């Protein structure tokens, strides 16, 4: 099967090569001088210094020694008539002999008729040729693309500033022969087959055409079964319709298979090549090629009877055609090697011609181009004082706005303005400040197509017709009679116009015009060029230089391209990309990068190749563990039961991950480790082993290969996990399921060989026997680690560098990396071409320089940093170049941007190796570290290359110096070889950045006591990481911080005591906050903060800081109290710290004892005392920490408890597997089963639960009613905004313990 596309590709390549060889200009003998044999009459020019045509051939010295114009300006040109169309391959120039007159740069133009010129382009831009540096040397240029033309025009652009324009020229090439047919738009040419049916598996059709019409059929063929092929012009573009053996779509209703080309109605020659092998098609128009696969079921194209060219005749109706015919010329028309036009010229019997001639008739139409949006205009005279007005012309443009026509009407009729505004034609007649008439017509007229406009006025009625729509013209009437004006200004107004002859309320027109008629008389625009008619400024006459800047579409990743006359724009909406050309991904390349930015677990889009061709993929990033897991869900992660499968009718299930295989492969290849859990539950269903070695169940991986090993086993071993550790149910087999038991068992494990992942399909064949059943589950694809984000290299000599293959980035280039250094300067990377280059360097301690040259001269961007960049900290650089702009960004400094010129060279052509950390000259090398280097989304493996390079070391230590601040709340940044992690041991918080609060709900009797007494025997067996659980029992200062939520007052929140001293934090009866200090036998110090009622069910944050005599209390991030003790004070021999109710209440202060009576009902969060986190120790290290918990302590988020009953606990699934997971020994099913035992059991459990709830509620309501009278007075003291559940909590403090137990059930 693989040989078919390979042969197809070879055949297509061969055909394409032969076509290009036959049509190219690189004929070995096509370099003859063509101008040296011409007579002087073959030369013409815009003007001549002597008034006569001087010999302008190369190396001629007679006469004036060459050509010089009367005036040296940008409007001059030298032209030659070569007599016939020839193949032109090269040109050469000299200056005028014996003078200081020579041209230093020029452009070329070509024409078949001496009219409607075409500029020579290279790289899609008007090409500028380098001229001479003196009068005698010859400057020779071989054309990259040959040209076929009869007329050649040299247009000087720059010349010797100390002299004038002077030229002697030569043109090289050879004769050119072709077969041409002219179609008048009402005829066609038929090629009849020798048999009824022509069936082909391969087709090659080639031709050239030129036309002034935007629509028309070039050729068509069809078969009775629905096959058809049609090539037609549609609005200046070529549409190819192609269907194979598909009777449903017809030409009249089906959209084209592909559309290519633009502005093809310019009366210039265009090349077409169609190559087909089976369903694979290459469609080329000029230099643009599109590959596609055609519709239909068969590989052969079946055409009945004939092919028609120029139109689609209706059978039995001579002169009638199905669609609009082609109007223009076709040249060298070949169908599968048959020269159709040659057959027609020789009147062969296969060819039937209509009114077709065999020479190309050229309409003598002169277009003009308005180049400048501020200074271009054309002035043509009219016939003044004629009763009425008549003006018509055609225009084409990409701009939405521009002046088309302005004229001052005679007899005081006012001023007529015709403009294009928002793509709509607007006609206004204005007299003084009064608008006497206004007409709006058309829409989207800035589509680049030719549109005709006709204005006719008689007396007080004016008519505006668009695109020859005489049936429904737009009309208006005026209050005055209209008389033709004296001067008509097209496109704009002169700068020096001082009167009201020309008005332009908007910018000048940029575009092309032709066929201008005034008072029903055509205007000779060549006379305008010669200066004998009218006037003009900034026009190209006899040339329409419109360009489609959206062909090809340089908007990447599916961005929509729109354009004006001078530039193009990209709409990146809904692409997942941004930037001037939709080059930059909106998303990061991995979950590791999201984690580095401080994100927590959740669904994210990742773009593994950045700005590369692969799109973003949605994944789940689990950023709650030390390893950052990336999970990709597929369409069937539930346990699925299978019955009735056998080798003849196997069960198969394909898995869809919501992305392409290329996206998944890129993610897997970038990860350090990937895995998928696979589970096979079985009852009399064998898994792998069979007598002949063929497995009963297998899975398909990324390369569409069959894999017979199961989870927990390595590739190539037909075993399960139990087979490796010899723990299978039957030692004769290597999987539990292969024991073939009549009871449920399973084989479960992880597949972790990255080259085989992900699992794309599972096949099961052994569930068709009696009592045979299987249930399988394949978990999501899970990966961790980013192999490239921390991929770093250290350069420690200036002469060292890494080299990589050439950076290919013709149209778009983006480079990003991190660096750190202490050096003053150095080159990060460099890549060279013949003329082009790209370089990034640190040019000074505070400057980054990005330099690039695409052939138009170097462009240099420099970003100045207000702080030093050689501070041995990591800094980020992103440099980008595209067809719209060049940019450089350093860290979070403002991005520096410079627009790219729309003309000139635009391809970045590099050919040397890419040097990283230095240059090819081994000078200005970089000293320091470079990390995570990406070029156009490709990740360079710096570490691997550094292993085999001298002067360079893989890796770079010292991440915490830059990223340590990302660890919050006392967390400590710890270095790793690849990155860092946050050690939250000394923090009351946890999580990857020590930002996740550790909090718990307290009931009235809950008590958490942390003991400071030493020694602790358990300390001998704990790890060093837990050392912070224990602390100094005699601190000289207190740093206390915690958050709380409660509705109960009074309450005791925290109590720290020694044998003589204590510190207590409590809420008074009125809800005020009180801090009580008893230190060093001083009197008890009481600090009250009564700014509000803190028992208001809102989260409050408290900080108490004492150092020596100074005490500061901060509540809700505001300093509420400062105090200086009279002498140095300190806690001595601290015994314990208690959260909630103090159980040993002997010796308690009376106020503390009152608050302690009710305990604490609410939530405490992130409790810290110096280096101790008692609440975290109770919840995370209860077995090793000196902490005692009495009563019920439920972990919960205090933030979630605001306005929620603190006694209501909601269970959530672990975020480690967001998709859920079942791991029961007996499989659960997601199918509907009719098992009556199961249904009965469920009903019984439900009934039991209902009766239990009724009994509990009845008893609770009875006891609550008995205590209601007693608590009625208490309830009046509570704040009105307290929730009833909190009031109930407080009320129940005086009830019996049995009642409390029932309430919390």
UniProtKB/Swiss-Prot annotation:
Natural source organism: Canis lupus familiaris
Membrane topology according to the record: Single-pass type I membrane protein
Function per UniProt: May play a role in the correct development and proper functioning of the peripheral and central nervous system and be involved in cell adhesion and intercellular communication.
Localization per Swiss-Prot or TrEMBL: Membrane
Disulfide partners: 30-174, 329-360, 512-544, 550-561, 555-570, 572-582, 929-956, 960-973, 967-982, 984-994, 1163-1198
Glycosylation sites: 282, 355, 496, 622
Gene: CNTNAP5
Protein name: Contactin-associated protein-like 5
Signal peptide segment: 1-24
Family: Belongs to the neurexin family.
Residue ranges occupied by any EGF-like domain in the UniProt entry: 546-583, 957-995
């Amino acid at each position: 099967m693989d040989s078919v596309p390979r042969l197809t590709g070879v055949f297509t390549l061969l055909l394409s090569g032969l076509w290009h060889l036959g049509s190219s200009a690189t004929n070995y003998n096509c370099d003859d001088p063509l101008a040296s044999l011409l007579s002087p009459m073959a030369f013409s020019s815009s003007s001549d210094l002597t008034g006569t045509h001087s010999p302008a051939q190369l190396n001629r010295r007679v006469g004036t020694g060459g050509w010089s114009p009367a005036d040296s300006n940008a409007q001059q040109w030298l032209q030659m008539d070569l007599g016939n169309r020839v193949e032109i391959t090269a040109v050469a120039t000299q200056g005028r002999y014996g003078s200081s007159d020579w041209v230093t740069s020029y452009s070329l133009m070509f024409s078949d008729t001496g009219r409607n010129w075409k500029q020579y382009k290279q790289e899609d831009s008007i090409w500028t040729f380098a001229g001479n540096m003196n009068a005698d040397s010859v400057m020779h240029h071989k054309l990259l693309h040959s040209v076929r033309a009869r007329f050649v025009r040299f247009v000087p652009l720059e010349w010797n500033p100390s002299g004038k324009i002077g030229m002697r020229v030569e043109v090289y090439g050879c004769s050119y022969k072709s077969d041409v047919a002219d179609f008048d738009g009402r005829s066609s040419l038929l090629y009849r087959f020798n048999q009824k049916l022509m069936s082909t598996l391969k087709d090659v059709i080639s031709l050239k055409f030129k036309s002034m019409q935007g629509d028309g059929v070039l050729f068509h063929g069809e078969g009775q079964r629905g096959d058809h092929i049609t090539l037609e012009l549609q609005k200046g573009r070529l549409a190819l319709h192609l269907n194979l053996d598909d009777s449903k779509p017809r030409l009249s209703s089906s959209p084209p298979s592909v559309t290519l080309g633009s502005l093809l109605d310019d009366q210039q020659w265009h090349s077409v090549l169609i190559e087909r092998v089976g369903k694979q098609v290459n469609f080329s128009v000029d230099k643009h090629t599109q590959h596609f696969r055609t519709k239909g079921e068969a590989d052969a194209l079946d055409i009945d009877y004939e092919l028609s060219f120029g139109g689609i005749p209706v059978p039995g109706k001579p002169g009638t055609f199905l669609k609009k015919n082609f109007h223009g010329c076709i040249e060298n028309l070949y169908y599968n090697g048959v020269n159709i036009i040659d057959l027609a010229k020789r009147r062969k019997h296969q060819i039937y011609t209509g009114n077709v001639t065999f020479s190309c008739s050229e309409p003598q139409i002169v277009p003009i181009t308005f180049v400048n949006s501020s200074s271009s205009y054309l002035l043509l005279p009219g016939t003044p004082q004629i009763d009425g007005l008549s003006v018509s012309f055609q225009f084409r443009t990409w701009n939405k706005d521009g002046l088309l026509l302005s004229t001052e009407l005679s007899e005081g009729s006012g001023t007529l303005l015709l403009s294009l505004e928002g793509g709509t034609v607007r006609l206004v007649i204005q007299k003084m400040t009064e608008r006497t008439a206004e007409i709006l017509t058309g829409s989207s007229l800035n589509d680049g197509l030719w549109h005709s406009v006709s204005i006719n006025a008689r007396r007080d009625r004016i008519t505006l017709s668009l695109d020859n729509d005489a049936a429904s013209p737009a009309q208006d009437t005026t209050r005055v009679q209209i008389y033709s004006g004296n001067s008509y200004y097209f496109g704009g107004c002169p700068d020096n116009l001082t009167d009201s002859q020309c008005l332009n309320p908007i910018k000048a027109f940029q575009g092309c015009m032709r066929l201008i008629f005034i008072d029903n008389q055509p205007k000779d625009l060549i006379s305008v060029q010669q200066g004998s008619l009218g006037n003009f400024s900034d026009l190209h006459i006899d040339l329409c230089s419109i360009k489609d800047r959206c062909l090809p579409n340089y908007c990447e990743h599916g961005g929509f391209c729109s354009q004006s006359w001078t530039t193009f724009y990209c709409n990146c909406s809904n692409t997942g990309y941004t930037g001037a050309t939709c080059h930059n991904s909106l998303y990061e390349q991995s979950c590791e990068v999201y984690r580095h930015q401080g994100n927590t677990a959740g669904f994210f889009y990742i773009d593994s190749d950045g700005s590369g061709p692969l799109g973003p993929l949605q994944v789940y990033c689990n950023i709650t563990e030390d390893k950052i897991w990336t999970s990709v869900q597929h369409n069937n992660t539930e346990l699925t039961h299978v019955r009735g499968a056998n080798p003849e009718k196997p069960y198969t299930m394909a898995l869809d991950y919501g992305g392409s295989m290329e996206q998944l492969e890129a993610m897997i290849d970038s990860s350090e480790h990937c895995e998928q859990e696979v589970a096979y539950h079985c009852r009399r269903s064998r898994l792998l082993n069979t007598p002949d070695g063929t497995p009963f169940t297998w899975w398909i991986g990324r390369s569409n290969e069959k894999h017979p090993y199961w989870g927990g086993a390595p590739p190539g071993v037909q075993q399960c996990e139990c087979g490796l550790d010899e723990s299978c149910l039957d030692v004769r087999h290597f999987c539990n399921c292969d024991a073939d038991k009549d009871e449920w068992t399973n084989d479960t494990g992880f597949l972790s060989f990255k080259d085989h992942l992900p699992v794309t399909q599972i096949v099961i064949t052994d569930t068709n026997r009696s009592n045979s059943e299987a249930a399988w589950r394949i978990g999501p694809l899970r990966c961790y680690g980013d192999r490239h984000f921390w991929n770093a290299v250290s350069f420690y000599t200036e002469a060292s560098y890494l080299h990589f293959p050439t950076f290919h980035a013709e149209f778009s280039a983006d480079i990003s990396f991190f660096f750190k250094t202490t050096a003053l300067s150095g080159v990060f990377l460099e890549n060279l071409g013949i003329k082009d280059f790209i370089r990034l360097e640190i040019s000074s301690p505070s400057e980054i320089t990005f330099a690039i040259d695409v052939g138009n001269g170097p462009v240099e961007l420099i970003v100045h940093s207000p702080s030093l960049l050689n501070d041995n900290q990591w800094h980020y650089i992103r440099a980008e170049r595209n067809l719209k702009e060049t940019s450089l960004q350093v860290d979070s400094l403002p991005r520096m941007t410079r627009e790219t010129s729309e003309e000139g060279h635009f391809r970045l052509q590099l050919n040397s190796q890419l040097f990283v950390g230095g240059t090819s000259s081994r000078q200005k090398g970089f000293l320091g570290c470079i990390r995570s280097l990406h070029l156009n989304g490709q990740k360079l493996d710096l570490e691997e290359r550094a292993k085999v390079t001298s002067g360079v070391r893989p890796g770079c230590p010292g991440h915490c110096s830059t990223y340590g601040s990302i660890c919050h709340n006392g967390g400590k940044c710890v270095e790793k070889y690849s990155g860092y992690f946050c050690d939250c041991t000394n923090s009351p918080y946890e999580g990857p950045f020590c930002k996740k609060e550790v909090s718990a709900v307290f009931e009235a009797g809950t008590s958490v006591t942390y003991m400071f007494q030493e020694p602790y025997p358990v300390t001998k067996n704990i790890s060093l990481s837990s050392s912070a659980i224990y602390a100094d029992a005699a601190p000289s200062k207190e740093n206390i911080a915690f958050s709380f939520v409660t509705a109960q007052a009074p309450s005791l929140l925290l109590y720290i005591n020694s044998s003589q001293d204590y510190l207590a934090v409590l809420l008074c009866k009125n809800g005020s906050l009180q801090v009580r200090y008893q230190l060093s036998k001083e009197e008890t110090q009481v600090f009250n903060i009564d700014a509000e009622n803190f028992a208001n069910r809102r989260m409050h944050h408290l900080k108490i800081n004492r150092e020596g005599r100074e005490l500061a209390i901060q509540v809700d991030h505001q300093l509420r109290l400062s105090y200086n003790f009279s002498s140095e004070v300190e806690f001595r021999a601290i015994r314990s710290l208690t959260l909630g109710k103090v159980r040993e209440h002997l010796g308690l202060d009376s106020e503390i004892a009152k608050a302690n009576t009710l305990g604490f009902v609410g939530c405490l969060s992130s409790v810290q005392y110096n280096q101790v986190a008692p609440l975290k120790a109770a919840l995370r290290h209860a077995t090793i920490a000196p902490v005692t918990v009495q009563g019920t302590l439920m972990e919960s988020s205090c933030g979630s408890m605001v306005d929620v009953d603190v006694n209501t606990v909601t269970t959530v699934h672990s975020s480690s597997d967001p998709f859920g997971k079942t791991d029961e020994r007996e499989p659960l099913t997601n199918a509907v089963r009719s098992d009556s035992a199961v249904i009965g059991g469920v009903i019984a459990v439900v009934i039991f639960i209902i009766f239990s709830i009724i009994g509990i509620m009845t008893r609770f309501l009875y006891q609550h009613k008995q205590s209601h009278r007693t608590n009625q007075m208490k309830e009046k003291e509570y704040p009105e905004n307290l929730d009833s559940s909190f009031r109930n909590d407080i009320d129940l403090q005086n009830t019996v313990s049995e009642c409390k137990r029932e309430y919390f059930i």
